[in-house]
Amino acid sequence: MKKIITLAALCLMFVNNSYAAGSDSSTEVVKPSSYSGIVKLIKSEKYEEAIQGLEKILEQNKYKQDPDILTHYAFSLRKTKNYTKAEEYYKKALSVDPGHRGALEYIGELYVDTKRLDLANATLKKLENCRCEEYAELKSYINK
């Protein structure tokens, strides 16, 4: 009986940790302990520091396919105007999770930033049916 309770508690902890990042990703893995601090750096617009931290995380094989980490890395790159590398990493995130709303929104914003409105609008169309925050934000970004 003790083993069952312990196993159930471990399962609940895993599920709770898996979704702590607020992702819509179905390919979620438990994030490294440094990840929440890196997200805070991004929210504080400290993109260079975030890039350094995310690069350390991405050196570990188990995180190279995490769409949330890839998206945050691409976002930070885009904010430092490294558009080519940012696009590469958004596409990596989307190859893992084609419906990742954050990656879709942000790659759409990258297309606007790089004057490719046709691609931005095509990306917006992919978000159209979700009627989610990402759709509204990308639509607003396109219409600025």
Model-predicted regions and their roles:
Residues 43-44, 79, 113-114, 130, ...:
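Register position in tetratricopeptide repeats
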Residues 60-62, 96, 127-130:
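Structural marker of alpha-solenoid helical repeat scaffolds
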Residues 64-66, 100, 132-135:
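Residue-level recognition of tetratricopeptide repeat
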Residues 72, 106, 138-141:
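Canonical tetratricopeptide repeat
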Residues 105-134:
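TPR/TPR-like (Sel1-like) alpha-helical repeat modules
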